[in-house]
Amino acid sequence: MLSTENGEIHAIPITAPLRVGDRRILFRLKRCRESLARLREHPKVALTIFAKGNLAFTARGPARVVQEPMLGAPMFAAIAIDVENIDDHRQRDLVVDSGVSLDWNNERTQRFVQEHLNALREVAASGE
């Protein structure tokens, strides 16, 4: 879940963000969405992850557009978060055993997610 702030907090779901090194996370937003305009105006963001394997953290830092349009997905803009702070939400007595449950079982959706990640990997490899 990505949160941005411009007088009020806006939270939007992010599909399959990609970690690039210790302090950078890539994701993409549709170019026609208001969330992209909000991010340009107010780049300070927080990305919260709760996922299988006891992943529970919030990565905070400025976000910026690194490729628009994306070469592998022209309807999208690639966004990088330059992580400045990480809040660890794990607790000794509680374990996160699953995150948001999505049905990735149909072939079309699996192909979409794979294409999504491949497009982000291309951005990461380009050094943008």
Give names to the regions the model predicted.
Residues 9-15:
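A positional/architectural concept
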Residues 1-7, 45-48:
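A short, Trp-centered hydrophobic/proline-enriched beta-strand micro-motif
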Residues 41-43, 61-62, 95-97:
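"Short basic amphipathic alpha-helical interaction patches in structured regions
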Residues 24, 44-46, 58-60, 76-80:
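Broad gene-expression machinery/nucleic-acid interaction feature
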Residues 33-37, 55-57, 86-94:
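Short, surface-exposed beta-strand/loop "edge" segments at domain boundaries and coil↔beta transitions
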Residues 15-54:
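A short mixed-secondary-structure module that forms the rim of ligand-binding clefts
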Residues 58-70, 84:
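Short beta-strand and beta-hairpin "edge-sheet" elements
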Residues 71-128:
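C-terminal edge-of-domain segments
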